[in-house]
Amino acid sequence: MDKRNAKGWLYLLPAIAFLGVFMVYPLVDVFVYSFEEGYNSASQTFSGVGLFNYRYVLRDPYFLQALKNTFILVIITVPVSTGLALLISLGLSSIEKLRSLFQTVYFLPYVTNTLAVGLVFMILFKKTAYTDGLVNVMLHWFGSPGVDFIDGPYWAKMFVLCFYTVWIVLPFKILILTSALASVKQDYYNAARVDGTPRWRIFTRITLPMISPMIFYLVITGFIGAFKAYSDAVALFGTDLNAAQMNTMVGYIYDMLYGDSGGYPSFASAAAIILFAIVLTITCINLLVSRKHVHY
């Protein structure tokens, strides 16, 4: 190894050490715990080794409900938030006056506390003895009887959770896509206009390919973020998410460790490995798809 390579590895050593201590080692540790049946963290003992923890988790109705909720959240919020962010970014890029003001307004939810936003959404959607909530008041204007979005039907609660998640992640995506659109050279657009190219074709043949790396980045991070959702559900429905049928996979893992059903690190580890495998699989699929559709 020459001096240049040795110096490079020396610079990388702090980052490698950090990743090894705080990411690789815990992941390996959790993987080992997931096979240890009846693991006791206090005495560091277990009763056996096998696949019992995985069988238990995959048959647990609470886990299956959390898995269903998480997949619905991912499937709805990632494409909706990315598509809305792209439309808004295109609109912001096409105006000159008040652009900075609109960018600031759209970015405000990103710097607002998550729980504070959750309280606002509860005021908007929750029915109480004193009020039906602002959204239901508006529905009454159109002759609708209204819906209890917080304590009512499952799909009403899922709608609020998806709406809330999109609201939270939208500002960051707008910021990224607005910057990506601003980085596209005007020479491409000028040449296309000289040739009389329609606007929709300019968008599909120039704009989308040029910003496709940023769109791919937002899709990947969106998938990972949606699979890690937990605080969003707590902000809206409280800590007893199993009773509300609105738990997520991360919430299930937390409950197995610290919740009312807590004290089962082996089950929590098995659920965490399942979540890791799902996220890793989807990420690999996205990487394979990006080779054909992302232009670097």
What are the roles of these predicted feature ranges?
Residues 3-296:
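A structural signal for multi-pass alpha-helical bundles of membrane permease subunits
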